[in-house]
């Protein structure tokens, strides 16, 4: 879902001066120029922005794989399983703390900028930051109380890892909000780099330093402590980025609040956020809950390798969401169809290029994590096939949420996420990790099919790569009649 979107485009002062951001596309565009930009160059901008985002994703993915590989080898498969299990919960709670604002900001801020409503843009940013901070700290308090109550039944390593993980939640949530604001202001590289490069790079540096200096025991608590420190650093960098990218017009107005309008789509987005994270982490959480933390670590490593094939789709989505928001606000349905089709093809081509070598090299890649992790090779194959199918459908979730259909999107995703978790729990008992992989992939396929049906029926758009083929007969008939 994404939570990661960004072609952004909208301001006043930079438009007059012709200022551009990294990659060559406008940092900000005046409200009077946005129609021309999206009417004539949406696909070109989408492609250029997607390439820039993909470059960051590739570098970040490589660093993430190296970081996870080194951490797994340093702390071992058992402790890595504990770390992966705790990290899955921390990520889930971090996204829950955003209350869906990290997605809705990508809809509201570009729309307000397109209309020159700077007071509302400033208002929604301030409002979301305050609500998220309060929610995250409440989750921390509840989490600490829960861990204290269950401490007697938890292994010391698991209990301490959870405490460190819970402390990470506020920093993760505030970083997600800050990154969304930066992307809405036009920062693709600047918003993605801290999360994709700095966080994992710093975490790896901390773990490696402790390892070589023999400064602390090598277990899951070390990895979680490194995650906490790197999350704090990333939040600081994102705040600096937002301050640098903020349009000057935003600083000269008093914030105006429209909380009721903001909560209406945000509540469904909260459901989407929880469901999306649950679906992607259901296997690791299910394995951990059943006491199979070692298998959870192996599955997490396999999932991390397979996720490389999702990078092109994520990169396209980065540029897709604000573009859809602006086109929908302008009532440009033709532009929506054009950009949606372009996004699907970019996603599929990029995913296919990543999937083929990954399927061939899954075994040796996992061997780098350690001998125990080779058991995850079949899991990589199953998960990659699901990612290829999802890529052919394009970033459909963004198309649904950015056109005001959050409730429908939330319902579809919630049903699929629940099915994914239930399927993992049921399949693990009989087929272990492989069963969890099948449940995850089948749910991903079902989710994309359900979204495609909704988009076709409700938005009257053809989703995925089949759109141009569906339109061919109609165009031919029109040409035959001289239309």
Positions of predicted regions on the chain:
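Interhelical loop/hinge segments that connect adjacent transmembrane helices in multipass membrane
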Residues: 14, 26-46, 216-226, 234-280, ...
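Membrane-interface junctions at transmembrane-helix termini in multi-pass inner-membrane proteins
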Residues: 172-197, 384-413
């Amino acid at each position: 879902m994404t939570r990661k979107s960004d072609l952004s485009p909208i301001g006043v002062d930079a438009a007059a001066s012709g200022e551009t951001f990294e990659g060559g596309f406008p940092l900000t565009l005046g409200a009077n120029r946005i129609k021309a930009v999206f009417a004539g160059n949406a696909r070109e901008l989408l492609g250029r922005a997607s390439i820039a985002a993909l470059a960051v994703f590739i570098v970040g993915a490589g660093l993430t794989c190296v970081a996870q590989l080194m951490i797994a080898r340093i702390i071992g498969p058992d402790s890595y399983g504990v770390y992966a299990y705790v990290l899955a919960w921390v990520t889930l709670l971090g996204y829950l703390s955003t209350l869906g604002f990290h997605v809705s900001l990508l809809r509201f801020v570009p729309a307000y900028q397109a209309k020159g409503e700077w007071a509302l843009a400033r208002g929604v940013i301030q409002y979301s930051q305050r609500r998220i901070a309060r929610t995250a700290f409440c989750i921390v308090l509840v989490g600490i109380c829960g861990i204290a109550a269950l401490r007697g039944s938890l292994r010391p390593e698991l209990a301490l890892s959870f405490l460190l993980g819970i402390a990470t939640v506020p920093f993760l949530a505030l970083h997600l909000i800050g990154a969304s604001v930066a992307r809405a202001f036009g920062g693709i590289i600047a918003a993605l780099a801290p999360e994709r490069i700095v966080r994992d790079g710093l975490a790896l540096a901390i773990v490696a330093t402790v390892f070589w200096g023999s400064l602390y025991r090598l277990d899951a608590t070390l990895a979680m402590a490194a995650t906490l420190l790197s999350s704090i650093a990333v939040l600081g960098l994102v705040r600096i980025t937002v301050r640098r990218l903020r349009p000057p017009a935003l600083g000269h107005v008093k914030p105006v609040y429209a909380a009721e309008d903001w909560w209406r789509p945000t509540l469904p987005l909260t459901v989407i956020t929880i469901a999306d994270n649950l679906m992607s982490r259901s296997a690791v959480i299910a394995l951990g809950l059943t006491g199979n933390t070692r298998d959870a670590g192996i599955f997490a490593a396999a999932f991390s390798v397979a996720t490389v094939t999702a990078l092109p789709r994520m990169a396209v989505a980065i540029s897709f969401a604000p573009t859809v928001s602006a086109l929908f606000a302008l009532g440009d349905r033709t532009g929506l169809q054009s950009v949606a089709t372009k996004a699907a093809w970019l996603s599929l081509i990029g995913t296919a290029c990543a999937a083929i070598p990954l399927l061939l090299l899954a075994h040796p890649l996992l061997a780098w994590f350690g001998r125990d992790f080779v058991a995850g090779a079949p899991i990589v194959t199953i998960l990659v096939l699901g990612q290829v199918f999802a890529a052919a459908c394009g970033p459909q979730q963004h198309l649904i949420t950015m056109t005001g259909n959050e409730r429908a999107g939330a319902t579809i995703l919630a049903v699929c996420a629940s099915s994914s978790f239930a399927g993992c729990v049921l399949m693990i008992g009989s087929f272990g990790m492989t069963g969890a992989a099948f449940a995850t992939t089948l749910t991903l396929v079902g989710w994309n099919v359900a979204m495609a049906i909704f988009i076709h029926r409700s938005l009257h758009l053809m989703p995925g790569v089949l759109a141009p083929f569906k339109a061919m007969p109609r165009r031919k008939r029109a040409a035959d009649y001289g239309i």
